[in-house]
Amino acid sequence: MTLKIGGIVPIVRVMRDTIIQRPVSTFVRYHSKRSRSFKKKANHKPGQVIRSKLGKTLEAPKTQPKLFSFGNFSGLDQPENKLKEMSSNAIKNITSFESLRIFPTVRSAMLEEIKYGYNLKSTYIKSKEELEIKPSPVQIAAIRKINQPRLRNVNAEKKLADKKASGQEILEDLQKSNEMNRLKIFTIAAETGSGKTWAYLAPLLSKLKEEDMRVFNMSEQSYADAKKTSIIRSVILLPTHELVEQVYDSLKRASKASIDLEASVNKKILQDPQYARYLSLPENQTSLNLNVVKWGSGDSHQKLFDAGRKRIDVLVTTPAKIQGLAKLNNVSRPFRLFNFVEYCVVDEADTLMDKSWIVDTTSVIRRLSKCKDLIFCSATIPKEFKKTLGKMFPDEFSIINIVTPSLHKIPKQINLKVIDAQLSPYNGSKTRCLAQALYAIHNDGTEQGYVKRILVFVNEKRDVQPLADTLIEKFGHREEDIIGITGADNADDRLAKIEPFLKPAELLEEDLDGSKVKVLITTDLLARGLNFNGIKNVILMDLPNTSVDLVHRVGRTGRMRQSGRVFVIIDKKTGKSWIKGLPKVIKKGIPLG
């Protein structure tokens, strides 16, 4: 006897005393007309009581979440429901950054930086001062977990009637010391464009400021000496120099953001003796005053050593740059600045932990012997990434996983359309299909008065320039409007080319090129983490190779709850029947597998 319940096909075995339902598949399959059809659905619903032939009853199990999973589009790991539920409950109860444990001046600087990057176009808000910034789900979940005190009630008075033996006191002191210094590993996974950067920056900067305040309140001289030490306190690792620039710019703006203590910090905090003394320092009156250093493409090792003559609070770089120090045969102890790093963030971890990067990334991590917090942050959790972490840290309880309920789901505010190049008038030409899509976007009446920016993704870098040339020569696009980028371009050229796409859209009359539409053609090189400010349209010229790539490409639009459109162009070779089900998958909120 076979039933189909809620999209799951279970096998039902009628035994003497019980009914056993064994799930066979939790995947959603989209079949072509020629594929075999399933048997008609039974009327049983999840949670319904089923009566057996012998009169025994058993409640039907609730169905597991459906997945959109096919072939190479099945490489994503699905977190346990319990983990998502825990995160969901916390998210429901918190609606303000004031409810989160963030150092007061860090909170103020963070809000100013978030407002700076907010796109007011197409909103009713006239100025950024009117914005009410609320934490996103991933920010709530991550800040709560990472900023939890390592020791609770450390300063509470002992309530034991009898004085403890000296041996017991020594043991407790050792246990406290171990707890304060042991390595804690966090993974942060949330949908693209959800605010993950500040999900790890807020705890990181808070810990740095709290440590400064602790040292200052112990001894002003110790605090002054600590600021002169030649060390790096924290490191943020990123896969590309574009991302290094992006994260560094956010940190620099936050570090230099103007802070009005009276206006932005709670009066109770200002009256707290430990905060009052530290915040009264002139250096804390107007900004975070943190030393943030970028070590990017083209920067010599000497730049790092020069910056390290005074304490570096945050270093933003790539794993390859740090590992490059090993080649300096004429420099004594080239890694000496990293001996006291206490906090390390591996951003875009699904990339930095794949086979192309893992050797450099893990080599850097191994050098951080004093690290207390190691944070892996990503928009996806590939199965291979989870296996790699399991090998690195065999004790599963040593890893604290932080996920959001919408992980691996394409945001519903993204409108995805599949265009079949086999149909008339394209007649099998994907390039003609692309040209028509660009024309339609240009004339659709949206973003009036602004230069429209469009991202086009292809799978191979060898296709970038030929496609750009075809759009210019055959379809009449201006050369200054079609921009192609590959890994062959040096980092400075890439930054110059993508600048119009990273900043808010310009008014038509202010664009120096006189452009009405700008098109950026690239590969997955630029699909990871970059915040393309206010981009409304993304075109996938080629079907991505995996669901990981699909999530990242689509995630260049629809960021921070803003709307976006994605056009997927298919032909006879890539026009699988299941790909046409993607729009429904998004509308129904089904995660990718």
From Swiss-Prot:
One of its GO terms (cellular component) is mitochondrion. Residues 1-36 form a transit peptide. It is found in: Mitochondrion. It is an enzyme of class 3 (hydrolase). The keyword Signal does not apply. Its main location: mitochondrion. Its EC number is 3.6.4.13. A motif (Q motif) lies at residues 132-139. GO terms for molecular function: ATP binding; ATP hydrolysis activity; RNA binding; RNA helicase activity. A motif (DEAD box) lies at residues 347-350. SUPFAM superfamilies: P-loop containing nucleoside triphosphate hydrolases. It comes from the Eukaryota. Residues 177-399 form the Helicase ATP-binding domain. Residues 433-593 form the Helicase C-terminal domain. Keywords: ATP-binding, Helicase, Hydrolase, Mitochondrion, Nucleotide-binding, RNA-binding, Transit peptide. ATP binds at residues 190-197. It holds the Pfam family Helicase_C. ATP-binding RNA helicase involved in mitochondrial RNA metabolism. Required for maintenance of mitochondrial DNA. Belongs to the DEAD box helicase family. MRH4 subfamily. The Q motif is unique to and characteristic of the DEAD box family of RNA helicases and controls ATP binding and hydrolysis. This is ATP-dependent RNA helicase MRH4, mitochondrial. It comes from Debaryomyces hansenii (strain ATCC 36239 / CBS 767 / BCRC 21394 / JCM 1990 / NBRC 0083 / IGC 2968). The gene is MRH4.
